[in-house]
Amino acid sequence: MWTVPVLFWVLGSVWFWDSAQGGTIGVNEDDIVTPGTGDGMVPPGIEDKITTTGATGGLNESTGKAPLVPTQRERGTKPPLEELSTSATSDHDHREHESTTTVKVVTSHSVDKKTSHPNRDNAGDETQTTDKKDGLPVVTLVGIIVGVLLAIGFVGGIFIVVMKKISGRFSP
């Protein structure tokens, strides 16, 4: 009688054995040193097509790694990356991009004296501003979890019916 639950437990746990093994861990990004050329620039890589700055200040004596913050010489001579324009965009597009702003959804609620903090002296016409949060990620996560649980139950139910049918104990 105990063989069927043990069989279900073993077959159900086989699916998790492969994911429990874990993946291989490669070299950390902090340990990779990008060699710099004479002017401190590295040619673009195949994967990013972006020019990156090399390590110009040498290695840090205490850690043996390249510094992450640009030196004072680099800050004074190079403009920030955000201010550089590409050949594909014109000055008009750049100015238009700077003038656009992102609008947050803000709601206002009036605050009554009854609902305000007792130690605070509030006027009756004061408003409280709050940012409205988007609930879509939470709903999506709950939907995925419920869907996975229903799928496991559905597949388990089919498996139980098939096992009963094979053993001869199933009578519709």
UniProtKB/Swiss-Prot annotation:
It comes from Mus musculus (Mouse). The cytoplasmic domain controls FRC elongation but is dispensable for contraction. The cytoplasmic domain is essential for recruitment to invadopodia and ECM degradation. One of its GO terms (cellular component) is cytoplasmic vesicle. Residues 49-132 are annotated as: Disordered. Glycans are attached at residues 37, 51-53, 56, 60, 63, 71, 77, 85-87, 89-90, 100-102, 107, 115. The lineage of its organism: Eukaryota, Metazoa, Chordata, Craniata, Vertebrata. The gene is Pdpn. Disruption phenotype: Mice die at birth of respiratory failure due to a low number of attenuated type I cells, narrow and irregular air spaces, and defective formation of alveolar saccules. Knockout Pdpn mice neonates are smaller, and approximately 55% died during the first postnatal week. However, approximately 20% survived, had normal weights and life spans, and are fertile. Residues 163-172 are cytoplasmic. It is found in: Membrane; Cell projection, Lamellipodium membrane; Cell projection, Filopodium membrane; Cell projection, Microvillus membrane. Belongs to the podoplanin family. This is Podoplanin. Residues 51-63 have a biased composition (Polar residues). Residues 23-141 are extracellular. Residues 1-22 form the signal peptide.
